[in-house]
Design a protein with these regions (language model features):
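Long terminal segments
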Residues: 1-26, 33-34, 42-43, 49-113
Length: 113
């Protein structure tokens, strides 16, 4: 039985057995026991018993002021409060820590030097 552990593009992030665990696209995010647990599209992020628990739009999903734990969207360029102000690129799924615009540009300059 094939096992895809993590693929952070438009498609599957993790499959265990026949069960989709994570999907970082525009639609379903997690299926457990035949139920959609989390939905990472432009509107709701997680539902429990018909209640919206988290919203995956331009807001951060987990942010403690310095660390971004999880964001199912684009590369983050600037955070103001708990809102993502600027972002670019299609792929980032999870990071630890946060780079400012200046730090990010410096990193890009180093990578392409």
């Amino acid at each position: 039985m094939a096992r895809v552990k993590r693929y952070c593009g438009s498609y599957i992030l993790e499959i265990i057995g026949d069960k989709i665990q994570e999907y970082c696209g525009r639609y379903l995010y997690q299926i457990s026991n035949g139920r959609v647990q989390e939905y990472c599209g432009p509107y709701l992020y997680e539902m429990k018993n018909d209640r919206i628990q988290r919203y995956c739009g331009s807001y951060l999903l987990e942010f403690d002021g310095k660390r971004i734990k999880r964001y199912c969207g684009n590369y983050i360029a600037e955070v103001e409060g708990n809102r993502i102000k600027q972002y670019c690129g299609p792929y980032l799924y999870e990071i630890e820590g946060f780079l400012s615009n200046e730090q990010m540009m410096a990193l890009i300059a180093i990578l392409f030097a």
